Amino acid sequence: LVVWSIVLARIDANHSRLPNGLTVPPALVALAACVASPYLAWGLAWPAAYLVGPGMGGGDVKLAAPLGVLLAALGGPFAVLAAVGLAGLLTVVRGWMAGRAALPHGPQMLAAAWAVGTFVGLKSSIAATL
């Protein structure tokens, strides 16, 4: 997952594209996981949020599905919503710092997913030891 995340972030940052070969297979696995476990469907809130408004590319939607489902498995709806909010905040801050409105969103999505996933994992580990 680390290598996949780094590769996607670099490609999107340099070319403003998320390749189908790296986003479609995980998105399909995420959809299959939602069929197997409806609780994981909370993860589809992330790509659904991008379908509502303009500005997000199809690659962002395909990336959001596996990230959202993985976070739903780790921390439920809260983890998904926290990552969506953090990704948006990171994108706004990065755009402000770069002085432009249009920029790739994938790197911030991946950073947010890793941050929230790490937090949820640490929280679960600490709770398990108490």
Language-model-derived ranges and their functions:
Residues 33-36, 97, 118-119:
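Helix-loop junctions at the membrane-solvent interface of multi-pass transporters
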